[in-house]
Amino acid sequence: GCDVINMRKFLYLAMEVRTGKTLTSLGIAQKLVRVNNVLFITKKKAISSIESDYKMLDPDYDLTVINYESLHKIPEKGWDMIICDEAHTLGAFPKPSKRAKQVKSLVFKNNCFVVLLSGTPTPESYSQMYHQVYGIPGNPFSEFKNFYRFCDKHVTVTQRLINGFNIKDYSNGKQSITDSMNRFMISYTQVQAGFESSIEEEILRVPMKTKTIELCKRLKRDLVVELTDDDVILADTGVKLMSKLHQLYSGTVKFESGNSAVIDTSKANFIKWKFRGSKIGIFYKFKAELDALKQVFGDALCTDLETFDSTDKHIALQIVSGREGISLRNAEYIVFYNIDFSATSYWQARDRMTTKDRKYNKVYWLFSEGGIESKIYRAVIQKKDYTLKHFRRDVQTTEFRPGRL
């Protein structure tokens, strides 16, 4: 890694989860002569873990760890190295995301070493690589003025019909993208690191309250349910119906007013009973699901890694924010209260317990009886996102009439 970054000032560590990306990047910074101030950008929940690694390594340079959402709070200049954790989150296309623009600006103003970290550099499309690196001088795509010119050479652009309009699809990136990145990348797998762990998954079926099932049936039939003047559940499009059923089958709902409510704590009650005496990590999808867990678990539940690691409390994390950059090595089991539509979320979140010394991991999925979760699961285990197309195919019931959506 030191040879690559000394030569090119840029290194991409494509290392699988739990193989030591953080310590490797901090160690590389220690070996570079001209590095005194390092900026480490990550997700908020990973900050404490990275600071612990820094203290353990005890290098000669100063380290500032910050989350992407707080980049506006730090000095724009004075950094000798910038490390971007979970770099694939910079990869939105065709337009660059706000965070990709912010990182580009920081790199430009500091002319510094850059290290990108990710266990999944291009989780959904090779095209995601461009905006991860476009702000780094000397990157392999610097000859292209923008993403569209990059696509002229590296992407097979197609047309997709969406809502009656022909939209250009830039997701079919070519193998040439990864070929171009090879000289900047170091890849390292769990197998290479000596991991021999396995993950066993078990699906647990949870009966929901009768009123919850009836509410779902009413919504599929009528596409609107008015509980009170203020509490209206509207599902007048396919996307809305998919989202509302996803919420309801796990016992929560977000009303048209923007307010949310817990209508059924069956899943939370089941978790408390099933895993009594065990220390667990719980992943939830919707914010109201955390409210349901708090109602049932009370003070026995925390939401930060530091408390989880130092007490006997369980931890609850939202799937998207907790799937990357953290380790739940102290959990006996991981329990999914709900499931995300994203295949990336599935593959990353289920791996949070894995360590080199741990040979066996058990992950539990809670699916409501008759709910939508098992249908989503079938898609994501095949590395496919669950989309409206899947939903319309799956929910063909007498109450649901797709022609109305």
Where do the PLM segments sit?
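A conserved SF2-helicase RecA2
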Residues: 341-350, 354-405
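Pre-Walker A adenine-sensing motif
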Residues: 1-4
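SF2 helicase motor core recognition
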Residues: 15, 22, 71-76, 118, ...
